A protein has these predicted regions:
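Short cysteine-rich loop/turn motifs with clustered Cys
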Residues: 8-47, 69-71
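Polybasic, low-complexity binding patches
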Residues: 37-40, 55-66, 74-114
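Short Lys/Arg-rich cationic patches that frequently serve as NLS/NoLS or arginine-rich RNA/DNA-binding motifs
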Residues: 1-9
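Catalytic histidine site
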Residues: 49-51
Length: 114
């Protein structure tokens, strides 16, 4: 596994931190478009979502992740119905609430630190 792949993957330790912090899907807790979901199974929180995605070298750390259900994770990743920007704003505010010194620039993998 490359250093980049390892750095962007959520470890078991980070996953546990996120699950303990969130206690469920952050968007379900805000009741964000849950009424539109036709399959209750999709609302089961079982995935870790990146704020800055792996495709943009987002780190696999608690400050860059939240617990989510399949419904909301898919909605966030695919930008369904033009909701991605709004969801990212909610996600950002949620993370800022938990980490006073939260900074997006610290969430991205840097091969060279200069």
């Amino acid at each position: 596994m490359s250093k980049l792949s390892k750095a962007t993957e959520f470890s078991t330790k980070e996953r546990l931190k996120i699950k303990e912090r969130d206690g469920g899907c952050i968007f379900c807790k805000m009741q964000y478009h849950t009424e539109e979901c036709k399959d209750i199974y999709l609302l089961k929180p079982n995935q870790i979502m990146h704020y800055i995605p792996r495709s943009h070298q987002g780190l696999g750390i608690a400050r860059n992740g939240a617990w989510g259900c399949i419904w909301h994770h898919t909605m966030l990743d695919n930008g369904n119905q033009g909701r991605r920007e709004g969801m990212l704003s909610m996600f950002r505010e949620y993370l800022k609430k938990h980490y006073r010194d939260w900074d997006e620039s610290s969430l991205v993998y840097k091969k060279y630190d200069f």
